[in-house]
């Protein structure tokens, strides 16, 4: 079996060790000859990489491992780029969340004004990675799971139309895992689903087991009462996530025939979200206080002891979708996966050039979207508004346009008026002066 060379772009991410453990657990179906980390923050990456070096030496010494801040060294001779970058890191996420809340608007990583701000930082970073890949390994594929995926996907569609990049999100996968628990299946691979929408903005219309039995009635009944909180809920799930999974019952009530993506909470119940937010302590603070500290302390312990048992790093099980995607391309498996792709008529009554999240069959040539057909007015109306926001953000970045970004924030369903949008925008510009292009 062919062995592959992979570079993880965003090597200093706290998600990287879990992805390395997941890659090691999947060597039987996706064997590696080389693994490289790339990051523009060398000091941060070094801690993560040195810990991963210990793990790799123990579990797979035959895999050639290196880490670098040099794009040429990182992107030369690779088959896949696995990208999860966060431009501005968590301190800027904190600004994305807290600035809108100061104006009475929800503050969220990928939704509303915060997601727009993050998108304006991410576009340039992801395009830079695409360009490095095309320069140094023109036959490679980029598997991008950097957020905000919807805005990034629109930017790559428009500004790098021929790039071999696939944009994928783990949120539907996480929700499907909970659905499988609710109906008593071993895992989400025991289900066959139909889903459509945009990234962080979609609906399941059909869920069956592999024998073709309809699981929707049982799911509807359960979710109407408990949301996506499964019977044996993981005690380690943070309070903010538990609230999001529980709130799905109210989102689902709007269209009881479907199962919603949890992120719709932010668009359909923004008043609830603001009322239940603490403007002084947002999700970014939770992550910095817990995940960031825990992963880095575990890595330092592993480095000091020279053995992996010294630190508690968890395998990122549901990140196995990244391996599913890579193996589908490498071995032409025609795996069915939810990807963010140009609509091109898959949803009949929706914009052809909108980036939609729908089931695709994946092989050597990338994704082949499955037909969705017509969608109802409710979903179409919501999606049209949100697609317009995403397109305006890319317009703003490309044209360096203050007005386009003001329009984008005004059009967001989370924002009550153009005057509030302008006040938020002006604060975001001040906070992002080191990251955004200068707007005129």
From Swiss-Prot:
Please state which protein family the record places this protein in: Belongs to the glycosyl hydrolase 4 family.
| Keywords per UniProt | Carbohydrate metabolism, Cobalt, Glycosidase, Hydrolase, Manganese, Metal-binding, NAD, Nickel
E.C. designation(s):
3.2.1.122
Instruction: Specify the protein name.
Output: 6-phospho-alpha-glucosidase
Pathway it belongs to? Glycan biosynthesis; sucrose metabolism
Where are the residues marked Increases basicity of active site Tyr as a site? 109
* Swiss-Prot/TrEMBL cofactor(s): NAD(+); Mn(2+); Co(2+); Ni(2+)
User: PANTHER family, per this entry?
Assistant: 6-PHOSPHO-BETA-GLUCOSIDASE-RELATED, MALTOSE-6'-PHOSPHATE GLUCOSIDASE
Give the species this sequence originates from.
Answer: Klebsiella pneumoniae
Q: Where is the active site?
A: 170 (proton donor), 263 (proton acceptor)
Instruction: Name the positions where Mn(2+) binds.
Output: 169, 200
Which top EC class is given? Answer: hydrolase
What residues bind substrate, as annotated? 93, 147, 283
Per UniProt, NAD(+) binds at 4-70
Print the organism lineage: Bacteria, Pseudomonadati, Pseudomonadota, Gammaproteobacteria, Enterobacterales
The coding gene here is: aglB
Choose any GO biological process term that the UniProt entry carries and state it: sucrose metabolic process
Q: Quaternary structure?
A: Homodimer.
SUPFAM superfamilies linked? LDH C-terminal domain-like, NAD(P)-binding Rossmann-fold domains
Question: How and how many cofactors are bound, per the record note?
Answer: Divalent metal cation. Requires Mn(2+), Co(2+) or Ni(2+).
């Amino acid at each position: 079996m062919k062995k592959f060379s992979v570079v993880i772009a965003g090597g200093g991410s706290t998600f990287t060790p879990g992805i390395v453990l997941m890659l090691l657990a999947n060597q039987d179906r996706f064997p590696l000859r080389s693994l490289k980390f790339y990051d523009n923050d060398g000091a941060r990456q070094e801690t993560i990489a040195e810990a991963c070096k210990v793990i790799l030496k123990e579990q797979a010494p035959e895999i050639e491992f290196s880490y670098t801040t040099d794009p040429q060294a990182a992107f030369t001779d690779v088959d896949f780029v696995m990208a999860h970058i966060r431009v501005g890191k968590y301190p800027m996420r904190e600004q994305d969340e807290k600035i809108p809340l100061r104006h009475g608007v929800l503050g969220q990583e990928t939704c509303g004004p915060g997601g727009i701000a993050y998108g304006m930082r991410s576009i340039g970073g992801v395009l830079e990675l695409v360009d490095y890949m095309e320069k140094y390994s023109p036959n490679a594929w980029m598997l991008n799971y950097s957020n905000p995926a919807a805005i990034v996907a629109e930017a790559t569609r428009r500004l790098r139309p021929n790039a071999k990049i696939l944009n994928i999100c783990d949120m539907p996968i996480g929700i499907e895992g909970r659905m499988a628990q609710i109906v008593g299946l071993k895992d989400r691979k025991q289900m066959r689903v139909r889903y459509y929408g945009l990234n962080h903005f979609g609906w399941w219309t059909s869920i069956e087991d592999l024998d073709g039995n309809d699981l929707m009635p049982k799911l509807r009944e359960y979710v109407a009462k408990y949301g996506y909180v499964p019977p044996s809920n993981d005690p380690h799930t943070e309070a903010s996530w538990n609230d999001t999974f529980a709130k799905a019952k109210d989102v689902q009530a709007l269209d009881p025939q479907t199962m919603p993506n949890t992120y719709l909470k932010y668009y359909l119940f923004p008043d609830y979200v603001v009322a239940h937010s603490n403007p002084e302590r947002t999700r970014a603070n939770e992550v910095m206080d817990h995940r960031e500290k825990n992963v880095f302390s575990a890595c330092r312990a592993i480095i000091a002891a020279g053995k992996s048992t010294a630190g508690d790093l968890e395998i990122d099980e549901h990140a196995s979708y990244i391996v599913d995607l890579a193996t589908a391309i490498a071995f032409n498996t025609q795996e069915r996966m939810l990807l963010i792709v140009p609509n091109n008529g898959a949803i009949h009554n929706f914009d052809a050039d909108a980036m939609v999240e729908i089931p695709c069959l994946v092989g050597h040539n990338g994704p082949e979207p499955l037909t969705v057909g017509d969608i109802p007015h409710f979903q179409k109306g919501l999606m049209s508004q949100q697609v317009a926001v995403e397109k305006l953000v890319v317009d703003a970045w490309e044209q360096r346009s203050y007005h386009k970004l003001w329009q984008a924030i005004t059009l967001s369903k989370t924002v009550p008026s153009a005057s509030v949008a302008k006040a938020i925008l002006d604060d975001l510009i001040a906070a992002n002066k080191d990251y955004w292009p200068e707007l005129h």
